[in-house]
């Protein structure tokens, strides 16, 4: 299954670009295995993908990660009590960094939080990521 996952990182880089996109690319290349926070439990499984979209300054899908297993409970943050481990794909994230998918091209133009990728959008995401 494929999921859209919102990240809200730094708004803009000094050159007007997205520092969030750069940060995601750096993470993919240096520390790709991460724990991602969830506000609710989702029926995720090993092999599912997180398509990570940056909320600002532009709304676009800029990275992809493969989920390692089901979400698990994590103490410490009552607003986001769940975590899921996923590994960013350096090659696919690099391709998305260079040619991101703007949300206005997707059927779900206003995703809220973590939602499933619509079937109509998957081919575009896979193509842009080189998968």
For each feature predicted by the language model, list its residue ranges:
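Aromatic- and Lys/Arg-enriched surface recognition patch
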Residues: 60-131
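Short, charged beta-turn/beta-strand-edge "cap" motif at the junction between a beta-strand
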Residues: 54-59
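Short beta-strand or tight-loop elements
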Residues: 46-48, 63
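Compositionally biased, charged N-terminal/linker segments
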Residues: 1-46, 117-124, 128-131
């Amino acid at each position: 299954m494929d999921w859209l996952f919102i990240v809200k990182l730094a708004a803009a880089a000094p050159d007007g670009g997205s520092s969030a996109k750069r940060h995601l690319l750096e993470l993919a290349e240096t520390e790709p295995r991460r724990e991602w926070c969830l506000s609710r439990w989702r029926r995720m499984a090993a092999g599912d993908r997180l398509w990570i979209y940056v909320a600002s300054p532009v709304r676009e899908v800029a990275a992809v990660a493969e989920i390692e297993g089901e979400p698990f409970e994590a103490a410490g943050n009552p607003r986001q009590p769940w975590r899921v481990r996923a590994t960013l794909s350096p090659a696919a994230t690099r391709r998305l960094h260079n040619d991101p998918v703007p949300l206005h091209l997707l059927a779900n133009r206003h995703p809220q939080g973590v939602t499933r990728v619509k079937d109509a959008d998957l081919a575009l995401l896979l193509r842009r990521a080189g998968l």
